[in-house]
Amino acid sequence: MQAKNLCFYLSDHGFGHIARNIPLIAEAVRRTNGFVYVVCGKRHLEFAKANLLELLTPEQSSHIRYRAEHTDIGLILQQGTLLVDTAALTDACAQYLAERPERAKQEADWLRQHDVAAALCDMPLWSISACEQAGVTLLYVGNFTWTELYREFLPEHIWKAYAAEYQKIQHGMLYALHNPEMLEFLPRAELSETSLVARPFHPDEIRAIRAQHTCPVVFVALGMSAQFTQPVSVEGVEAHFYVTEGVPLTGSNVTVIPYSTLHTQDYVAAADYVITKAGW
């Protein structure tokens, strides 16, 4: 077993990025004697740590180091809608890009100080330049880049600045169902395609969820970007709804799943129907 330090740079836009990397982090820990650093948002790291404590032994878990950072902008939506707030997103991305050079420089210093041999990037733009400056091999793992999304909404100088960073990537692993448009922005990358990844399911928990209901079970998630203020009653609907926080459904047949819930994947597996946005 090799003793190499690794680092995961993960988007804190929603919980999909951290969730899909939990199995990868666990496997990385099992395969190295070095430290595995995980850089993401504070709540995201709390979620990851709780999951990884279940997947790994205490000795293995002791090899993980968590570092809380706001890593990504993602999308900003108009309140009460799923429409992009172009003005707010433009301002946020402009500030993010202005901070990128200094942030990348500081991160490159950190990578050298911690003797990181390789990094995995799932979205955060500044980590690409940081690894390039530090001479650290970076693997981009994902199913899209922000560039092909942002060019639909943002000024050209912003999405092209994102494109310039993604074009530095030399190694990429693309999930099944990845956005074909992303290939345009990875011209230098040696790419491989893989399947999908998910946290393990728990059959007993799935059966217990289903046993509570004789009606259809519906899972609803609209992501962390959406902020709704107008409630929608589903009281008369012949179904039970499990919803993530922020989904505005109300009624005695609605159960809200807190962000602190470890195994949201079991609610998905227990559902007869899933209503969601185009996320992980």
Model regions: which residues?
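A short, glycine/small-residue-rich beta-strand->loop->alpha-helix junction that serves as a flexible
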Residues: L10-I22
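Donor-nucleotide binding loops and adjacent catalytic segments primarily
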Residues: I25, R199-Y273
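Conserved nucleotide-sugar phosphate-binding/catalytic loop shared by glycosyltransferases and other
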Residues: G34-A98
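Short, polar loop motifs at secondary-structure junctions
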Residues: G41-E46, M123-W126, A176-E181, M224-S225, ...
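Active-site regions of enzymes building and remodeling cell-envelope glycoconjugates
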Residues: L53-H70, V136, R188-A198, G236-T264
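Conserved nucleotide-sugar donor-interacting segment of glycosyltransferase catalytic cores
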Residues: R103-A163
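A donor-sugar binding/catalytic signature common to diverse glycosyltransferases
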Residues: A118-M123, D266-W280
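A nucleotide-sugar donor-handling region in carbohydrate enzymes
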Residues: L149-Q227
